Regions:
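N-terminal/domain-start alpha-helical segments
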Residues: 1-121
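Short, Lys/Arg-enriched segments at the junction into DNA-binding effector domains
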Residues: 2, 114-171, 175, 228, ...
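Residue-level signal for beta-strand positions within conserved beta-sheet cores that form or flank
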Residues: 23, 72, 133, 209, ...
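Nucleotide phosphate-binding site architecture
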Residues: 37, 55, 107, 152, ...
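Generic structural signal for secondary-structure transition and capping sites
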Residues: 45, 71, 118-122, 169, ...
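Positively charged, aromatic-enriched patches within helix-turn-helix-type DNA-binding elements
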Residues: 143, 148-155, 159-219
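A short linear beta-strand->loop->alpha-helix hinge motif most characteristic
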Residues: 209-241
Length: 241
């Protein structure tokens, strides 16, 4: 998972980053709240670890921006030296999902992050299974079948589809998709838009098939797997996509 760390103390930042890297996560450390805010308009993360007091824009302000502008399920963990009970209450009431006081205990930090991610992304750790609804993935042949028929996909369209199905519920920015699938973000974001449009059409990614691609204005997309209550019942009057 991609984790953003806001920590202006280099020693603490190294401990947090090392601990989470050892747990298999990708980390980006910010020592300045203003810089982090600027990057949040370009980058997507799956969890945030915030210190309280940092230069320019402090942790609670960052938390407020996250809650106002990003999907509500994104987990936020405060890791701070503020250990008064009132501080803990204030942080949780402001929208943090958990609160941990320094000094940092590596195993506890890993456990808290794992628990937050498990609650926020219950489907993400599950591999794509052959027979996901009407979508069947042949990972060896790099093919996807819809209702028993192999869909004609270009190589990059297949990679994009596989990435979406492996990351349900996550906000995927244009930059993130470009870096993961094209190896660089120095490409026009319309490349992603074009591929996504073609993929939605070819794979018929819509609620009637139990999935949907939700555009997140100015950022990117979120791929959602719907439960039975959210899936419309097909009728003979259903319109074509």
């Amino acid at each position: 998972m991609r984790i953003a760390i806001l920590e202006d103390d280099p020693a603490h930042a190294r401990i947090i980053e090392k601990t989470l890297l050892q747990a298999g996560h990708q980390c980006q450390v910010y020592g300045d709240g203003r810089l982090m805010l600027r990057e949040l308009h370009r980058q997507s993360y799956d969890l945030f670890v915030l210190d309280w007091h940092v230069p320019h824009v402090e942790g609670p302000e960052i938390l407020g921006w996250i809650r106002r502008n990003l999907p509500r399920h994104l987990p936020v963990l405060f890791v701070t030296s503020r250990d008064d009970e009132q501080d803990v209450v204030e942080g949780l009431q402001a929208g943090a999902d958990d609160y941990m006081t320094k000094p940092i205990r590596a195993l506890e930090l890993q456990a808290r992050v794992t628990a937050l991610l498990r609650r926020a992304y219950p489907e993400t750790t599950r591999p794509v299974q052959p027979g996901f609804g009407d979508y069947v993935f042949d990972l060896h042949r790099r093919e996807i079948s819809l209702r028993g028929k192999v869909v004609d996909l270009k190589p990059k369209e297949y990679e994009l589809a596989l990435f979406l199905f492996r990351n349900p519920g996550r906000l995927l920015t244009h930059q993130h998709l470009l870096e993961e699938l094209w190896g660089t973000s120095a490409i026009d974001t319309r490349t992603v838009t074009t591929h996504m449009s073609q993929l939605r059409r070819k794979l018929d990614l819509r609620p009637q098939n139990g999935v949907r691609v939700v555009p997140v204005y100015g950022l990117g997309y979120r791929f959602e797997v719907l439960d039975s209550a959210e899936t419309p019942t097909n009728t003979n009057n259903d319109a074509s996509p």
